[in-house]
Amino acid sequence: MASKRILKELKDLQKDPPTSCSAGPVAEDMFHWQATIMGPAESPYSGGVFLVTIHFPPDYPFKPPKVAFRTKVFHPNINSNGSICLDILKEQWSPALTISKVLLSICSLLTDPNPDDPLVPEIAHMYKTDRAKYEATARNWTQKYAMG
């Protein structure tokens, strides 16, 4: 069941890739993908290329995929291990969702962080109290880690 669904999503992604994202299996393992997300133009991540790993559980799509950033990113909802605090990857997951929708949600999280549900409280605090410093730091990290 899972591998059929994953294969279908791969075909759909190749046919109609989401804006500024790409994804596909690593080697021959259909349950382990790598995705690339381009930093959104209207965000401090602009110009960056962010690598993301996707691990599908055996009971996908009934359980959400595990998605994590491999590229370091300065963001209130993404921690230093690359874990992403995003409701659709946790309690709001639904089998109707696809990897394409997940990648688009991550892109919009880069543009619009959610400081009220932070994974990194210090960054959320900076985002709320000193937006200029947050944006400068995020831009700096993007240049350092996502433009190599």
UniProtKB/Swiss-Prot annotation:
Induction: Not induced by heat shock or wounding. It catalyses: S-ubiquitinyl-[E1 ubiquitin-activating enzyme]-L-cysteine + [E2 ubiquitin-conjugating enzyme]-L-cysteine = [E1 ubiquitin-activating enzyme]-L-cysteine + S-ubiquitinyl-[E2 ubiquitin-conjugating enzyme]-L-cysteine. The active site is at C85 (glycyl thioester intermediate). Its EC number is 2.3.2.23. Keywords: ATP-binding, Nucleotide-binding, Transferase, Ubl conjugation pathway. This is Ubiquitin-conjugating enzyme E2 8. GO terms for cellular component: cytoplasm; nucleus. GO terms for biological process: endosperm development; protein ubiquitination; ubiquitin-dependent protein catabolic process. Highest expression in young stems, old leaves. Lowest levels in floral buds, anthers and young leaves. Pathway: Protein modification; protein ubiquitination. SUPFAM superfamilies: UBC-like (SSF54495). It comes from the Eukaryota. Residues 1-147 form the UBC core domain. PANTHER family: UBIQUITIN-CONJUGATING ENZYME E2. The keyword Nucleotide-binding applies. Interacts with CIP8, CHIP, NLA and XERICO. GO terms for molecular function: ATP binding; ubiquitin conjugating enzyme activity; ubiquitin-protein transferase activity. Accepts the ubiquitin from the E1 complex and catalyzes its covalent attachment to other proteins. Mediates the selective degradation of short-lived and abnormal proteins. Belongs to the ubiquitin-conjugating enzyme family.
